[in-house]
Amino acid sequence: MTNSNRIKLTWISFLSYALTGALVIVTGMVMGNIADYFHLPVSSMSNTFTFLNAGILISIFLNAWLMEIIPLKTQLRFGFILMVLAVAGLMFSHSLALFSAAMFVLGLVSGITMSIGTFLITQLYEGRQRGSRLLFTDSFFSMAGMIFPMVAAFLLARSIEWYWVYACIGLVYLAIFILTFGCEFPALGKHAQHSQAPVVKEKWGIGVLFLAVAALCYILGQLGFISWVPEYAKGLGMSLNDAGALVSDFWMSYMFGMWAFSFILRFFDLQRILTVLAGMAAVLMYLFITGTQAHMPWFILTLGFFSSAIYTSIITLGSQQTKVASPKLVNFILTCGTIGTMLTFVVTGPIVAHSGPQAALLTANGLYAVVFVMCFALGFVSRHRQHSSPAAH
């Protein structure tokens, strides 16, 4: 594989994460405007965004098999057509049913693209380099999560309709579409060149189960925590701006943490540093929940920084449980993480209604403790040390 081809594929991976990050994180910015557009209360409008999450979940789950049937380049190009149709549907339709369908299609497209992006990184890089590359790729999710809410705020402040925000997000996919030209993708399944040696199917092992549980608990814990921090802070008497600043601080330090750890991880055994980071994140979250208002910004900044490498390290370790990176295995762990996203309000909503926001934060803290236990237990069964090598292809 040529170096320019590898760079193109790597950029497709970066942009695939940016696309999903933009779609997921911009939701809160435009929800009120969309509710006004359809003359609905915001509470009932938020339910329609479940279609976006459902699309992401279904596509990541199915793409473990679709990758072996439909070439990756074909999937990405077809995804561009679907993206254009979905954005056009948002622009020209005043039907709530069509809006929900368009959101579902956007979810499908971003889920397929993100699973392809993850798989490309696991194919292009090996060993410790794979972990640092995946981490840098994941930082594009957070970067888009910082940039596109600002784009949305800029457009909405000038009374430009909300659907132009999604047109701007579509430009990310346009860049992916352009990059597919003159670019060779790894072939899978029936499209792959089969050698004379029979392919040995590898068993995943119990370590994959530990990592899948860790992925689900981590995402559910993280989103359950960050979704209710503003309400919790307001309950303590903080202003809306100060409560919002806590969330911004978290994502900002999360992004800087990803960049820092994409360099740091190369020098450590991945399972050991993951266990340390999971333990630190659980302790820092507990200190945030039980600490004074004066210390809350510092605790959430350090929590964002030290928890930034956890999810990507889980995926990287999963890909290293077999000698050859398996798209089904990587997608299985991604699916478990996405289930965590889907369950966020299903789990935390009733807890907040019954016991208040602090109970939701403590639940998230408990989930982080489960992540620590899973990562610690993984140390006894992980196969990554025998499968990882420091060199890239």
From Swiss-Prot:
Pfam families: MFS_1 (PF07690)
Gene3D superfamilies: MFS general substrate transporter like domains
Keywords: Cell inner membrane, Cell membrane, Membrane, Transmembrane, Transmembrane helix
Location relative to the cell: Cell inner membrane
Keyword Transmembrane attached: yes
Cited PANTHER family: L-FUCOSE-PROTON SYMPORTER, PROTEIN TSGA
Recorded family membership: Belongs to the major facilitator superfamily. TsgA family.
Protein name: Protein TsgA
Cell inner membrane as UniProt keyword: yes
Range of residues in the leader sequence: none
InterPro entries listed in its UniProt record: MFS (IPR011701), MFS_dom (IPR020846), MFS_trans_sf (IPR036259), MFS_TsgA (IPR023528), MFS_TsgA-like (IPR050375)
Transmembrane segments annotated in the record for this chain: 11-31, 51-71, 78-98, 101-121, 134-154, 162-182, 206-226, 245-265, 273-293, 298-318, 332-352, 361-381
Membrane-topology descriptor: Multi-pass membrane protein
One Gene Ontology term of the molecular function aspect: transmembrane transporter activity
